[in-house]
């Protein structure tokens, strides 16, 4: 059997599975977890978002440590758009960082208890909390949104970002959707001084393309090398990987010229 994710009308990815080991449904979300010979387990959320258990650290480390190794004082972090608690676990490696995890669907979240290796450790961490809505009076130094948002959906999040904050969000695959992402980046770029796409190196997922945006900080020039190199127990992230994630092929950089602010 195979589980399939389609990233465009001309491109799809298939993963070999053995059997379904969990099927959970709530009012707004569905979760299926399959046994996988290559990745131990594969979680399929809402028939479109795939999480590969053995590769969770690859994306989670990048999403958390890219902004947190650039902002000098990231006291408050908001994570939204996913059930992936591993991003929060990685963010909590940074001392004194408080993490708010925006998620209303408690049923689906707790159905992933055996899928995420650090589920209990994260959920009961003193600097972590699950919230159902954003406090309009609170601002965050870092906001990480792990799903693709429309320009209309993304605008309200800017109100919760501190003036020197860093915003991370997912992009569609830049190779498959170059023109639509160029327009999308143009729509976001006028809010920020820096707006640069980055890619998870060696990722098997076609949707591992993201945006780093800030009014103040540059993801390469302001990288805190000592902080990045002092992190312990990581599988993927390090300072050189961080810098290389922002390097685009020349033809792609040329195609996106004018929409990237670096």
From Swiss-Prot:
Location of this chain's protein in the cell: Cytoplasm
UniProt-annotated binding residues for spermidine: 84
A single Gene Ontology CC term: cytosol
A molecular-function term among this protein's GO annotations: spermidine synthase activity
Gene Ontology terms describing biological process: spermidine biosynthetic process
Keyword tags: Cytoplasm, Polyamine biosynthesis, Spermidine biosynthesis, Transferase
Catalyzed chemical reaction(s): S-adenosyl 3-(methylsulfanyl)propylamine + putrescine = S-methyl-5'-thioadenosine + spermidine + H(+)
EC numbers on record: 2.5.1.16
Ranges for domain PABS: 1-262
Pathway involvement of the protein, from the record: Amine and polyamine biosynthesis; spermidine biosynthesis; spermidine from putrescine: step 1/1
Classification via InterPro entries: PABS, SAM-dependent_MTases_sf, Spermi_synthase, Spermidine_synt_N, Spermidine_synt_N_sf
Quaternary organization: Homodimer or homotetramer.
Cross-referenced HAMAP family: Spermidine_synth
Biological role stated in the UniProt entry: Catalyzes the irreversible transfer of a propylamine group from the amino donor S-adenosylmethioninamine (decarboxy-AdoMet) to putrescine (1,4-diaminobutane) to yield spermidine.
UniProt protein name: Polyamine aminopropyltransferase
Name of the gene: speE
């Amino acid at each position: 059997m195979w589980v399939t994710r389609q990233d465009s009308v001309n491109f799809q990815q298939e993963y070999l599975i053995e059997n379904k080991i969990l099927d959970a449904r709530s009012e707004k979300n569905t979760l299926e977890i399959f046994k996988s010979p290559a990745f131990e387990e594969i979680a399929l959320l809402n028939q479109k978002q795939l999480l590969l258990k053995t590769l969770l650290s690859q994306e989670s480390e990048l999403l958390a440590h890219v902004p947190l190794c650039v902002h000098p004082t990231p006291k408050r972090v908001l994570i939204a758009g996913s059930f992936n608690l591993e991003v929060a676990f990685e963010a909590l490696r940074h001392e004194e960082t408080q993490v708010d995890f925006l998620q209303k669907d408690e049923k689906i979240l707790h159905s992933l208890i055996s899928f995420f290796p650090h589920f209990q450790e994260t959920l009961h961490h003193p600097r972590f909390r699950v919230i159902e809505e954003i406090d309009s009076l609170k601002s965050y130094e870092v906001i990480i949104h792990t799903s693709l948002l429309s320009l209309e959906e993304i605008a309200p999040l800017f109100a919760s970002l501190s003036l020197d904050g860093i915003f991370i969000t997912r992009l569609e695959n830049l190779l498959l959707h170059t023109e639509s992402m160029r327009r999308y980046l143009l729509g976001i770029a006028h809010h920020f001084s820096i707006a640069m796409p980055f890619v998870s190196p060696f990722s098997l997922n076609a949707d591992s393309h993201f945006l780093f945006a800030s009014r103040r900080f540059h993801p390469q020039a302001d990288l805190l090398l000592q902080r990045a190199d002092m992190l312990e127990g990581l599988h993927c992230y390090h300072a050189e990987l961080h810098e290389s994630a922002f390097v685009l092929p020349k033809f792609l950089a040329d195609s996106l010229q004018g929409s990237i602010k670096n």
